[in-house]
A protein has these predicted regions:
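N-terminal Rossmann-like or analogous alpha/beta NTP/dinucleotide-binding catalytic cores
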Residues: 1-116, 203-216, 255
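Active-site cores that bind ATP or allylic diphosphates and position pyrophosphate for catalysis
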Residues: 96-223, 228-234, 242, 267
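Conserved nucleotide- and phosphate/pyrophosphate-binding catalytic cores
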Residues: 47, 51, 55, 184, ...
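Short, histidine-centered active-site or binding-site loop motifs used for metal coordination
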Residues: 7-11, 41-43, 184, 188, ...
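Hydrophobic alpha-helical segments in the ANL/AMP-binding
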Residues: 27-28, 61, 179-183, 404
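A secondary-structure boundary/capping signal
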Residues: 40-42, 74, 179, 222-223, ...
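Short, low-complexity, intrinsically disordered N-terminal peptides in bacterial proteins
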Residues: 1-3, 128, 438-439
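Gly/Ser/Thr-rich beta-alpha loop segments that engage phosphate groups in nucleotides
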Residues: 15, 20, 176, 199, ...
């Protein structure tokens, strides 16, 4: 049987690293097993769901390279839900309830006050129906046998259904809650594996019985540990560190996906070139049960290491017009992200603002301009210029190199000066040294 996974976001906001991680794990598991990855838009909440977020989610997944084989929307499947709901109703597996939220809350407090679990108490079949009150609907759990399923990450999961409330599946206004439509979709789409956060474990227990009530075998479940921000690394909430922010910052998708695929597992986080590489090593047996700590700085480090090894052909179409392979190979060891390239290219071929130097530093760069003007310019220009300045001024180390770097590049640090000086050319180098000496 072919593996089928699904990612089921609600179009009420943009993707953040938490649900990107869930999407990635579903994608990688399907890819590793030659299966199908489905995007299911859970848009039953008509008030909060928007077409804009629907489009943005699909655009973000496309940017990440997590392209689904199929896209379905729950808002287009209400007829299917209605038909299956009526089948369960006829079988006595869903039933009407008439309590108000206030009545339910009062009963919950009473049970807790008695030291009892706040489990919903079913009403007698002959209980009178309140007049002029519409019902909500609950799924009737089978209390006669325990709920047991094997979780690919957490191992055997066992629940006593008597300690679970019959879950509400439909509101008074006829709108759907999450649990039942999700099961109906998974049956219809032949989903074989449900991969999601550990906060859904109890949902999976109830849903296991829903699958069986519909005459279907429950899928395999994998409940992964939740993602949390590494302490002290970022003041923002995890949810704000999402696709829009990452795209704006120029993070390479594969750098983010690399980190999200490996954190919380026993595998080291090392740069990879493609999703294929991540899929090969993806295995739920490597996942731990402790919270997975996400550190944005780790993404930045992986992104930089990725930059330092990217071939020119891999980035040619994303670089400014006229960018050369020589420029790329010279500058890439200093790039943190691709967006840094244009500014460094200006150092080679554009204009910079002359730096503010001390009196002694201005005298040094004035001498450097005179030396540079007399050189036969080559790949050895930087070495020849600094050797001559050491001999004539007696300066060395930072006292010599730092003012020259500032004057020639406008930067405190950067790539090796020999390559920069050779690439920017004699005329530009002399002009910059003279400008810095006069400021």
């Amino acid at each position: 049987m072919s593996v089928v996974t699904r990612f089921a976001p609600s179009p009420t906001g943009r993707l953040h690293v938490g649900n990107i991680r869930t999407a990635l794990h579903n994608f990688l598991f399907a890819k590793k097993h030659g299966g199908i990855f489905i995007l299911r838009i859970d848009d039953t909440d008509r008030e909060r769901s928007t077409a804009e977020f629907d489009s943005a989610i699909r655009d973000d997944l496309d940017w990440l390279g997590l392209k689904p084989a199929q896209v379905v929307r729950q808002s287009e499947r209400f007829d299917l839900y209605e038909r299956e709901f009526e089948r369960l109703r006829a079988a006595g597996r869903v039933y009407a309830c008439y309590e108000t939220p206030e009545e339910l809350e009062l009963r919950r407090k009473v049970l807790l006050g008695r030291g009892l679990p706040p489990v919903y108490e079913r009403k007698a079949a002959d209980e009178p129906v309140p007049e002029a009150r519409k019902p909500h609907w609950r799924f009737k759990l089978d209390h006669d046998r325990p709920i047991v399923f094997h979780d690919l990450i957490r191992g055997e999961q066992r629940f006593d259904p008597k300690l679970l409330s019959d879950p509400v599946v439909r509101r008074e206004d006829g709108s759907w809650l999450y649990l039942l439509p999700s099961v109906i979709d998974d049956v219809d789409l032949q989903v074989t594996h449900v991969v999601r956060g550990e906060d859904h474990v109890s949902n999976s227990a109830a849903q296991s019985q829903m699958f069986e009530a519909l005459g279907a075998k429950p899928p395999e479940f994998a409940h992964e540990a939740l993602l949390v921000m590494a302490e002290g690394k970022l003041s923002k909430r995890l949810g704000s560190y999402g696709a829009p922010h990452l795209r704006e910052e120029g993070v390479e998708p594969i750098a983010l996906l690399d980190v999200l695929a490996r954190i919380g597992t026993s595998l080291p986080v090392e740069p990879v070139e493609s999703l294929d590489d991540l899929a090969v090593s993806f295995d739920f047996s490597t996942f731990g049960r402790a919270p997975a700590h996400f550190d944005p700085h780790e993404v930045e480090l992986i992104n930089a290491r990725l930059m330092h090894n990217l071939l020119f052909e891999a980035v040619r179409d994303r670089l400014p017009s006229g960018a050369s392979e020589e420029d790329w190979l010279l500058l890439r060891p200093n790039l943190q992200r691709l967006a840094d390239f244009p500014a460094w290219r200006d150092v080679l071929h554009g204009e910079i603002n002359p730096p503010e130097l001390s009196h002694d530093e201005r005298l040094l760069v004035k001498d450097a301009a005179a030396v540079a003007e007399k050189l036969a310019w080559s790949g050895e220009a930087w070495r020849e210029m600094t050797e001559e300045l050491k001999r004539t001024t007696g300066k060395k180390g930072r006292e010599l190199f730092h003012p020259l770097r500032l004057a020639l590049t406008g930067r405190e640090s950067g790539p090796e000066m020999a390559g920069l000086v050779a690439r920017m050319g004699q005329e530009r180098a002399v002009r910059r040294l003279e400008a810095a000496a006069k400021r």
